[in-house]
Design a protein with these regions (language model features):
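Loop-to-transmembrane-helix entry motif
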Residues: 1, 136-139, 143-147, 258, ...
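Short coil/turn motifs that cap or connect alpha-helices
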Residues: 160, 164, 323-324, 336
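Gly/Trp-centered helix-boundary motif
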Residues: 1-155, 159, 163-242, 329, ...
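Transmembrane alpha-helices
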Residues: 141-155, 280, 306, 325-357
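Hydrophobic residues within alpha-helical transmembrane segments
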Residues: 8-12, 137, 149-156, 258, ...
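Hydrophobic/aromatic residues in alpha-helical transmembrane segments
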Residues: 11, 157-161, 270, 283, ...
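Membrane-cytosol interface at the C-terminal ends of specific transmembrane alpha-helices
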Residues: 218-259, 268-330, 342-348
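Glycine-rich helix-loop "coupling/hinge" segments at transmembrane-helix boundaries
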Residues: 263, 274-279, 289-290, 303-305, ...
Length: 374
């Protein structure tokens, strides 16, 4: 029953995040104004509507992003339960107005009076007049998005590396010595030119949106693959018998040392250091949290693959001549994800706490984005 309570709470947060523009919005959900039917809350902020008189003459132009909707004389209007947006500032209720304190309101006649009940700030305001209740509602969307996106990135990295480390270990994957060393060289140059040299391009991409940011990451990934491929092709041109001897690739050692290296550095301190030198963007924060949170997932995946690789159905797949990729991703990995999902669930909560801490400190997240921490 306790688990069901947590599940219902999660569903509640998802519903709040999905319906945030309907629950908290400073524009009406529905309005009838001078014979026109408007749905301002569901329209783009840059939209403008022209209001005409019964004779067809232009009477008024409503620009949605700057119109003070509370001062208009509507024939009929339906407001959101919280009639404030998280980024809108109430200049008459600045400096941390209390929920039970005196709150001011500018009515339709332009007179400053006591705020009516439906326009009161239920949880008060912050220093610049932003409604705290609206910030909590819309912050739910940001926090859930941060948790899901960042742990999605961490899951892809952790499950992939953990599966390779657990299945192959240090003595199952072999390749020619020259190809092994040239692969490492290609990987080094690929990481340098793919991510180190393109750090500003990556930051600019995420500042323009998640799609542009993901496109830049795909380009960087392509550079890494191209670099490794080129160096592996070069290795074929070197015909030295000694270098053509096969050697084991210690994937488990590489992954385990990488996990230990990341775990030896305080994660919050590492994230603060990285976010302090890159452009402020919520998407960059998600990526940084994701690429620093994969170690726990990789350890669980590695441990499960170490157990599963010795089971009969995996050995049967190998005996039938199935490729290693098919054996890992189609047979072994699906049976190893149960404990990994537990780690991912805790990781989502941890990512939300990290983002809230960064927002509280004013690091990484832009000032115009309201989150639980800010």
């Amino acid at each position: 029953k306790v688990a069901l309570v947590c599940l219902y709470l999660l569903f509640l947060l998802i519903i709040i995040a999905a319906l945030a523009p309907v629950i908290a919005n400073d524009r009406p959900l529905y309005a009838e104004y001078k014979g026109n039917t408007l749905y301002p809350a569901f329209a783009d902020q840059s939209r403008t509507d022209s209001i005409f008189t019964s004779e067809g003459k232009l009477d008024e132009v409503l620009q949605y992003d700057i119109t003070d909707w509370r001062t208009l004389d509507f024939n009929k209007v339906i407001w959101a339960p919280i009639p404030y947006s998280p980024e809108s500032m109430d200049r008459y209720n600045r400096d941390y107005v209390s929920p039970n304190g005196k709150q001011r309101f500018k009515n339709k006649e332009g007179v400053i009076t006591d705020a009516p009940r439906k326009f009161r700030h239920l949880l008060g305001t912050d220093g610049i007049g932003r409604d705290l209740a609206s910030g909590l509602i819309h912050g739910t969307r940001i926090s859930l998005m941060v948790g899901l996106v960042s742990m999605g990135i961490a899951s892809l990295i952790g499950i992939f590396l953990g599966a390779l480390a657990g299945f192959f270990g240090d003595n199952k994957l072999k390749m020619p010595r020259i190809k092994y060393h040239f692969t490492l060289i290609g990987l080094f140059f690929g990481l340098f030119y793919g991510f180190g040299h393109r750090k500003y391009a990556l930051a600019d991409g995420f500042s323009q949106g998640i799609l542009n940011g993901m496109l830049e990451i795909l380009i960087s990934t392509g550079i890494i693959i191209l670099s490794v491929t080129i160096f592996r092709l070069i290795s074929r041109l070197i015909k030295v018998n000694k270098l053509q001897e096969e050697t084991f690739v210690p994937i488990d050692t590489f992954v385990s040392r990488g996990i230990e290296l990341l775990n030896s550095i305080p994660r919050l301190l590492l994230i603060i250091t990285i976010t302090a030198v890159v452009e402020r963007s919520i998407w960059i924060v998600m990526v940084i949290i994701g690429i620093t949170s994969w170690t726990g997932i990789a350890r669980f995946t590695r441990a499960e693959l170490l157990r599963i690789r010795s089971l009969e159905f995996v050995q049967a797949a190998q005996s039938l001549g199935f490729s290693s990729a098919r054996t890992i991703f189609k047979h072994a990995l699906p049976n190893a994800l149960a404990p990994v999902f537990v780690s991912i669930a805790f990781g989502i909560a941890s990512a939300i706490l990290i983002e809230s801490g960064l927002s509280f400190l004013g690091i990484g997240v832009p000032d115009d984005i309201v989150t639980w921490g800010s």
